[in-house]
Structure formats: C-alpha cells, structure tokens
C-alpha cells in the first residue's frame, strides 16, 4: 500500500521525459505451469471487501526468532525469492484524471541482513513513474521453519525530479516496529494477517486471502491456481490493492478495489534470472543505497548491522 500512496504524493512533482529501454541478456525463467485460456477471471468488482481490521495490540503476528533455522532459503510456493531473480511489473496509476505509466523492478539480491537475530534476504526494488525513478528500496524477507515468508522491514528512499524527498524506514525491533507475514505457507481463503508494524512511519499494512484457485493472463504468460490477496492499511481501510500470486513465480498482477484514488494496475512483463555481471550491478546499487541510508536514517537504519 505504501507504493500506492507514494505515487499520489510524487506524481504531480515529476518532470516527464522519454526513456529508451536497454537491451537485456538475462535468461527468462520458465515454470512448470502450462499456459491456459482462462475460463473465469478473478472477481475484482470495485466494491469494498470484508477485510477484518487488524487490531494493533491483539492482531500482530507472533514473531519467534528461534523458528528460523534456514531463513534465507525462501522457497514458498507462492512467494519464492531465489537470489538473482528479477520480476518487472508494468502498468499505470491515475492522477487527476490522467493515466500515468508505472513500472516496478523487483530484484532478489544475494545479500544478507541480520534483523532481530534472523538472517534476511535483501530485495532491491525500483519504482518508476513516467520513466522517472520515484523510489529505491531495500526490503528484508525471511522464511520460518513452517514455510511462512516474513517481512522484517524496509528502507525506502523517495525522490521527486531526481532529488531525495524522504526515507520512511521501519525495521523490526526498532522504534516499536514488529515483523509481519508476507505470505503464508498454506494460504486459506478469508485468513487475515499483519504484514508488519512500523508506528513511527505509520506503516500498518495487512492482508487477507481474498480468493483461491483463480486463473489469469498477463503479457508474460497465463497462470492457473492463482491466489488473490487483498492488502490495505489501518489508515486506508476502505482502499485495497489486489495482488495475484502464481505458483513458482510470485506476484504476477496488481489490481484495486474500493476507494483507491490511484487505481493502480500492474502486470508481470519480465521474469528472469540475472547473469553474474547483472547481479553484481544490483549488488552495487544496494550497497550504495545502504550508504545513503546511514546518512538519512540515523535513528533506524544506522542502528542495524551492515549488509553481508
């Protein structure tokens, strides 16, 4: 939900320019899921969904650092995070009646960061609006012994016209922040859960398993047995992002429901395994962002152990 709010904040400030795409030699990743012609699309009517509000006192997840023996081996069926994989989702948001091109590049690095005694996988995320980089982010995930993928925090830098604007970081264990669950090992329809708690920056996202067994097609492929998770936050409980997850891939589509002013829609257009050189480039970007974090987030990020 935070990316959605970021677009609403920064889009009016951004100067548009034309971007020429660079050629890539990354290897496309194929999965064992056969293409299908969808018999029924997911039901995403623009009406509020009945998502239980997460009580900040009673509904936070029970995080146990001792339950993470092999935490960086994230092989969750719906949210695998293999180092060197990259997902690119492309689409649009709406702002003042205008359709704004939007693209997110999600790259799993081979870096590790220890948070609350747990070794986490570092993901490097780039968020583009009209071709401009409006956010770069370090995100931290770990898988517990039961196969659940946890979210232990993030360091996002927000930009407008190429200049730093803000860095609303939250990391579990600091300033009241607590880890949440990104993806259950066995999602059950109707189950809701906190995705993290960062009160210092009003990060209160939660998810609810909205639908199971769906079929959907995106530019890259068609997928069956897709699950749909409705995500919202305590501050925006009438606005939902609908995130579609395919087996062996992860997030393949994003839609919206309710009072979402930006009406963000995204579809998977690239799913690749980076070359060693490409992964090294992303690693350098992550280290550079960490150096910036030490400057801009002295009370949060600077209090953590460095990337490994």
Spans of features found by a protein language model:
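Bacterial signal peptide processing site
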Residues: 23-26
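C-terminal motif of bacterial Sec signal peptides marking the signal peptidase cleavage site
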Residues: 18-21
């Amino acid at each position: 939900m935070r990316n959605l709010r970021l677009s609403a904040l920064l889009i009016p400030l951004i100067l548009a320019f034309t971007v020429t795409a660079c050629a890539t030699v990354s290897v496309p990743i194929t999965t064992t899921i056969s293409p299908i012609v969808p018999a029924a699309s997911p039901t995403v009517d623009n009406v509020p969904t009945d998502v239980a509000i997460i009580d900040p006192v009673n509904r936070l997840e029970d995080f146990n650092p001792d339950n993470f023996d092999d935490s960086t081996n994230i092989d969750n069926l719906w949210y695998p995070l293999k180092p060197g994989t990259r997902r690119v989702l492309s689409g649009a948001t709406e702002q003042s009646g205008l359709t704004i091109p939007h693209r997110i590049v999600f790259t799993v690095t081979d870096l590790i960061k220890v948070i609350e005694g747990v070794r986490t996988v570092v993901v490097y995320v780039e968020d583009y609006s009209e071709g401009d980089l409006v956010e770069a982010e370090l995100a931290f995930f770990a898988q517990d012994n039961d196969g659940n993928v946890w979210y232990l925090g993030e360091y996002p830098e927000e930009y407008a016209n190429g200049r730093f604007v803000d860095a609303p970081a939250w990391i579990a264990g600091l300033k009241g922040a607590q880890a949440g669950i990104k993806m259950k090992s066995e999602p059950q329809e109707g189950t809701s859960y906190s995705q993290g708690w960062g009160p210092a920056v009003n990060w209160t996202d939660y998810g609810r398993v909205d639908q199971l067994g769906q079929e959907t097609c995106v530019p890259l492929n068609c997928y069956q047995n897709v699950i749909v998770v409705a995500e919202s936050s305590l501050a925006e409980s009438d606005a939902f992002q609908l995130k579609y997850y395919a087996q062996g891939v992860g997030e393949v589509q994003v839609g919206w429901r309710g009072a979402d002013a930006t009406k963000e829609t995204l579809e998977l257009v690239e799913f690749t395994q980076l070359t060693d050189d490409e992964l090294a480039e992303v690693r350098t970007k992550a280290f550079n962002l960490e150096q910036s974090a030490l400057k801009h987030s002295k009370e949060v990020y600077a209090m953590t152990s460095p990337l490994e």
